[in-house]
Amino acid sequence: MPPRPNKRQQREQEELESLGGPSHEGEVSSEDEVAKRSVKNIAGAGFAALLTPEEDGQDSGDAGSPQPTRKTKKKKKKGPAPPRSQTPVMTEPPQSSRTSPNIPVHPKNEKKATKKAKAREKKAGKDELDKALAELSVNEAEMRKFFGAKVVQANKSTSAGASGSSSRRKPGVLRSNLTHPQPSWWAAKQREGLSIRVLTESETEAKMERQKWDTNEEEKWWTVEYSKKYKSMTMAFMQTVMSGDPEGFWNLLGKLPWHADTLLQLSEVYRHREEYAQAMDFVDRALFTYERSFIGAFTFTSGLNRLDFDHVENRPFFLAIHRQATDLQRRGCVRTAFEFARLLYSLDPWNDPHGALFHLDFLALKAGMSQWLLDVFDLFAARKETEAGVRDSRLNPSLLPGWSYARALALRIDEDANKDGIHTASTSALIEAITSFPSVVPLLADKLDVSLPTSIRSHRNFRIETDSSSLSPSVAALHLLSHLYVQRSFSLWKDAAHCAWFSSTVTSTFSSVSSVLPTTDRHNQFLSLYSNPSPQYSAYRHIMVLEASYRRLFSFIPRHVLNAKSLACDPLPPPTTVTEYNQAFFAGTDDLFALRSRTRQERVADERRLERLIPDAAFRGQLQAFFEAHPNFAERFPGGIVQFAQIAGQLPEDVLEDMMLAEAMGGEGLQDGGMPGQMPGFADFMNEGVDERQEPLAGVDNAPIRLVDHRQENLDAGVGAGADEDDEVEDDDEDEDEEVAPMPVRVLRNLLGRFWGGNTVAEDSSDDEGDRPPPVDDGGVD
């Protein structure tokens, strides 16, 4: 007796019966095949339970379709029996598809399983997407705000370096300790025209004599030096500054992309446009330019390497760090700003030329580095006591009004952290600050909305000064620094407990006020220190760099300082300067855009190009004669007559006529001994003997014409970054293959005809001849 068929086999039999009743032979053959399948199922019953529904469907499909090996065996043994048993399955279902639409059972199961699998994959994909969105919900700007851009960038670098294949594909990464070089930056060489050297012993002694300092054997003073090409670039930069055209800076970067003064000037241009991201990108590039010039002996971590601010070559680096620290404060990265301010202070702590200490009294508390401020204050206070009788113009932080108040607040914060309810040390420090610098009290009270007694408000020592018209330089500096500290640091005192502590301390200290407050030793030492010009200029320069935020404090700067000769690239040079951008500094320097002697190959190439531009030989000779007859005019076009012809075809006729007319009248735009095409006032600006600053140019008629085909595109691609001075000769094949479009010569012909007469132009075979009127006989024989 055959075994009982399973449910699947029974379902197949029911489907076959519903098709219309097969013949008896088909029934017999189907029974035989069912028996064969049953035997196979019994043989593999142990593993049949492990099969999935999809695998069962495949097995059933294979059973219903003829196999090649089985078909050959069936042909030998049974003949046509196997095809008869398979006929109802293969041929009948398509014919009866209208009456029984549910015939393909197994493909339907497969579709259902496929749909379920796709649904599961879609759900898993949604889960992964939700996870990714949850991870990215914290904006990178917030991460930078809380942790600083340095930490976020370091995290990115770590994750990027985890994949070995991607790191191997990176070409060469620019390294820097001060910035994060971007992939969009130009290619950089080793030094980029800058080098650094140690000051000689005689130079160091001269500096100590100028500053009235004692020699410190442990310190080492350095200065940056310019190469010949970098100095030529700086001279062209000064000429562009005097022209007042910001577009000229892009032409300079085409010659030397890594020029710090140009980068800082472009940064100011973008800052005035309120494009702060692009502005700080140029500041980063300027820092990177100087950092590459520092050799291994000049390190920031030793604390003994100094950069001489009296040399103009070093001053762009000071300015770049100051602007970087200021922008970091604007972005809320106070800890990074604190580190940059410390770096700025360490370059020249005895002069502090950019007033880094005026940043640090605020940033130390804001960044949670109050202990550092206390340590520095105590160190210089001890030095002040040991050298009490020595006259020294070195800057001392313990004598500054902002540091005295910041020290009292730092002690108060530490006492609150240690749960010290007595506050003896902080109150004593605050009383000392109030008695030494009472000018801060009314300013800070107004910012904190603290009411002061009338006896204090009306006292002469608590008077609020708004300018320096009736004050001595040292007293004016005291009120200037008082305003500066309150305007920057009043937010640190906004806490209710700090306001109450400040109000109660002031009221209790001055419960009975005499007509004149006794002066303290700290107050007298401050006035003595700021009687020297170097500390005064440090405070003035600090305000001038931060012009946008502290414009109203300019009233404390003397008039002769504001009227002094200075530029945005070098704000307020020090009175003890050794070098500055003047005629002596640029002596023997070649003009970067001057007309140089062209080689034979270049002259031959120019002739071929000019033939393509101006096919008329007679007119071409006339144009060459005019160009060679006016060397001052030719100096405006470093590319030679070809560049002049190209520009002439692009300029309007009236502009070109004015240029040539000015040259034909004697070249009034050029000054004796000046650079070709330089701005009026440039020579006076470079002259050290000039007292008053020359006004910038109102027009640009005498400006040098510089043809630059690609500006930002070439710079971003690194074009010109590695160009050397000796790579100026082009290959002959390139000159021959270069396509030059003919230019319309009618404009030049008309202009030259006005200067040299209309009958001097030779006969021309071009079609333009018919458009011109017949020549006129000037002799009157018509």
UniProtKB/Swiss-Prot annotation:
Compositionally biased intervals (Polar residues): 86-102
Entry GO terms, CC: nucleus; RQC complex
Its biological purpose: Probable transcription factor; part of the gene cluster that mediates the biosynthesis of clavilactone A, a meroterpenoid that features a unique benzo-fused ten-membered carbocyclic ring unit with an alpha,beta-epoxy-gamma-lactone moiety, forming an intriguing 10/5/3 tricyclic nested skeleton.
Keyword Transcription in annotation: yes
Keyword presence, Nucleus: yes
Species classification: Eukaryota, Fungi, Dikarya, Basidiomycota, Agaricomycotina
PANTHER family (alphabetical): NULP1-RELATED, RIBOSOME QUALITY CONTROL COMPLEX SUBUNIT TCF25
Pathway: Secondary metabolite biosynthesis; terpenoid biosynthesis
Annotated segments matching region Disordered: 1-37, 49-128, 156-180, 717-745, 758-782
Compositionally biased intervals (Basic residues): 70-79
Subcellular location: Nucleus
Any Gene Ontology biological process: rescue of stalled ribosome
Family matches, as InterPro entries: TCF25/Rqc1
Protein name in UniProt: Probable transcription factor claV
Chain intervals with Low complexity compositional bias: 157-166
